[in-house]
Amino acid sequence: MTDPTSFAAAWIADWNAHDVEKILSHYAEDVVFHSPNSALRTKGEKTFFTSREELRPYFNFAFHIRPHLRFTLLNFCQDRQGLALIYQDETGATATELMDLNQLGQVVFARVLYDR
């Protein structure tokens, strides 16, 4: 099992650095990624993504529309399959990202939940 403290710290740091390639390195090539923002950002064309390549423009767009995007880790929970990161953004909104990890410590399934 991937060390959750190290994973969470690296994941948050890469998001805060706005380094899309480093962010994507946390995800498997064939990741399945669900977020309520998927439909909003793709004008209803996608409700989830099924690869790292599909995530690249989605993450880039997030930094384009939110140039001051910043996450603060609040907590994490773990089990044998993966972990959940609970974090807050620069606006004060809280998110929980549920992540199933493969044996390489990469996210193979993610689901993001937001408080607003």
Predicted regions and their residues:
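Short, low-complexity N-terminal intrinsically disordered segments enriched in polar/charged residues
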Residues: 1-25, 29
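A structural signal for well-ordered alpha-helical segments within the folded catalytic domains
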Residues: 2-5, 53, 93
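Hydrophobic pocket/interface hotspot
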Residues: 11, 23, 31, 55, ...
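A solvent-exposed, acidic/Ser-Thr-rich amphipathic alpha-helical stretch
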Residues: 22, 28-74, 79
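A beta-strand edge to alpha-helix "cap/lid" segment located at domain peripheries
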Residues: 56, 62-116
